[in-house]
Amino acid sequence: MVVRNGEAIDPRGRCVVYRMRRTQRALDNPALETAIAAANVLEQPLVVFFGLLANPPMANLRHYTFMIEGLAETAQKLVQRRIGFVARICAGASSDREFARFCAEVRPALVICDEDPARRDAKWTREAVLYPPTPLWSVDADVIVPSKLLEKEQFAARTIRPRIQRRLEEFLKPVGNRSVRVPWKDDRRIKSPSVSRELTEQLHLDGSVNPANEFRGGTDAALSALRRFIRDRLGNYVSGRNHPDIEATSQLSPYLHFGQIGPHTVALAIHGAAAPARDREAFLEEMIVRRELAVNFVRYNPRFRTLASIEPWARRTLAEHARDARSHLYTEKQLANAETHDPLWNAAQ
């Protein structure tokens, strides 16, 4: 957990607020559990806020349908746990202003949010003063070993692996699901749209990519996918994962991406599986070491969005070969439409 400002907890506050972003689940969520623990100590109710961008950049109907299916389930499970859930459609490129308005409505004693490795210190500072004098804490709930503990950018799996392995025993434990002492009472003055697939109609989304009906969003679907993977495919993971014609991978990526299942839940289930050790270890290498290497890169490399972030030798190589003759040249549309000479590329598309 990171304290983002120096404000004291407001004794006049009426609740604790958890601003959900990357960790979109009601179970096995370290940030949510931290918020519950704080609410219980303060003897206050807990409410979760989620901001939906009306004009999300680079998002389409498939992404948002999957995400909203998960949010609908999350909202239901939170209510079952006597925790409030408020969603707001937010104009502009950020939900910060809408969240500030929400905080003015509910007057929190404390705000807890998901850690975001892409959010630079300057952005955290701006957010921390949106709703003074409320303290702001962030919790790294999307990885197993908190990314802040690694302190600097790691350049390869071989450098980050021993650092993660040294801390795994400390952090790879069941998250648990506490009970709240003071239930949230709905207030009709606090507006929140119903969270369902129909909500996508109120957002400006790219409709050229239809929902993937074979993938349904939500923690229940994620847990079912995890059980199927362990039962049917984990034992062939090493031999089959790099063959696109063999269904050997976990199919958990979209659920991990939207935080609908946590890496703790997956890793503990894989550890306890009856599959061969080499298959279990290979999967955990990808899901823990390689995934957290990517998070480390985004957290500590300020130029992670551009080619300027790559190593100098790689940039030199690209420049040296920029004018090399190519046997085939394709437009972006041809590549996307699988109109190339390469059957493997075409099959992947």
Outline where the language-model segments fall.
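Glycine/tryptophan-enriched, flexible segments
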Residues: 12, 146-148, 153-325
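Trp/Phe/Arg-rich N-terminal binding region typifying the photolyase-homology
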Residues: 1-175
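Contiguous, well-ordered alpha-helical segments that form the cores/surfaces of helical PPI scaffolds
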Residues: 32-37, 250-254, 265, 346-349
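Alpha-helical packing segments of well-folded alpha/beta enzyme cores
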Residues: 31, 70, 74, 222-229, ...
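Charge-dense, low-complexity intrinsically disordered segments
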Residues: 22, 61, 65, 213-220, ...
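Short, glycine/acidic-rich beta->alpha junctions
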Residues: 27-31, 119-120, 247-248, 279, ...
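Extended low-complexity intrinsically disordered regions
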Residues: 328-330
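Helix-hairpin-helix/helix-loop-helix acidic hairpins
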Residues: 332-349
